[in-house]
Amino acid sequence: MEERTRAYLRGRFGDVYRRAEIDLPPRADDREWGYIPWTAGPDTTMVRHKSTLDLGSMTSFLERKCPRHVYFSAGTYDAPGAATMDEKHWQGSDLVFDLDADHLPRVTLGEDSYAEMLSKCKDALLRLLDFLERDFGFEELTVTFSGGRGYHVHVRDAGVYELGSEERREIVDYVRGNDLALETLVEAEPVGGRGLENPTEKRMLPADGGWGRRVTTRLEAFADDLIERGEDDAVATLTEFDGVGERSARAIYNVVADNTTAVKRGNVDVHPAFLTVARRYIDETVAAEQAPIDEPVTTDTNRLIRLPGSLHGGSGLEVQRLDRAALDDFDPLVDAVPETFVGHDITVELPTEHTVELRGESLTVGPGVSTVPEYAGVFMMARGTAEKATE
């Protein structure tokens, strides 16, 4: 990034911060703070181990430093400004989740557009919230658009505040569906009947919640589809499953047709051949419904995370706290564009042609010097695809 570009962005970030109203996280004085300035060179060095006492008021700090990125710690400490983690004396931490398009299995880097990546990341966010709200019962969630290519979720609950890294890793494993298998998911239920010397058991997926609910929902749709197809078409479909021949396929179809209610309730012991189907649907459910969060962010109790209301130095977009009810309608490429950058044109220079999708419009510019809306120019300069041209 050229010095002219860096100076321009620093100045305009400062203009945003002079108008901004920043809401600090709870217990802000007990948290570590850090920031990345607009320094020259390819490497970005974070200034960290700061407390609010070191920075002064957040408003004056942002106006004075105009930082490229601003962070606060998930953890709270007795001495947040101490130079080492041992000296800080950890008290507890928010439970933080990070979803980034770079880590999503459904995103194809180099092929998906920025807008497509954000859309897929939002889908993953909704799946994560389903886990946190329905499975864990968390009520107080703070959802934030990262300003880049993803979202952050903070859980501030007394029940998770003092969890260590290993306990947090168990939560990661759950929402990612790590190592989820039929044998660990099913629950044994006794089979009733008078006069049984040796009572038997049947294995059931717990359909009332958790991963069992998700798998059972898909098995319900599978059973309905199989019956609707009819035997011959259903057998042809089932033989496409690994390890299922025609004989097993007919057995599966017949057992589903004859025991539809049991299958929909999650009974996987209706027939030995049905176990193959159940295992397949567990794998499919995990692939479709897991939340591919970034594990190190959640397990690191000292993690620094972006400050809502600040700007992301790699995009010029706002790190924006989101109301849960408004999440469905939120479009980051429209709603996170700072108003300070709207209504002005600037000149930028690009080495190659580049397309930007912002504020509901698609703009193709370059190569060479072009006049563009400032919000588009800031976005391209921050992402390193353009430099500031002389006006």
Swiss-Prot record:
Pfam families: DNA_primase_S (PF01896). Coiled coil: none annotated. It comes from Halobacterium salinarum (strain ATCC 700922 / JCM 11081 / NRC-1). Disulfide bonds: none annotated. Heterodimer of a small subunit (PriS) and a large subunit (PriL). NCBIfam families: primase_sml, PRK00419.1-1. Its cofactor is Mg(2+); Mn(2+). This is DNA primase small subunit PriS. GO terms for cellular component: DNA-directed RNA polymerase complex; primosome complex. One of its GO terms (biological process) is DNA replication, synthesis of primer. The gene is priS. SUPFAM superfamilies: Prim-pol domain. Keywords: DNA replication, DNA-directed RNA polymerase, Magnesium, Manganese, Metal-binding, Nucleotidyltransferase, Primosome, Transcription, Transferase. Gene3D superfamilies: DNA primase, PRIM domain.
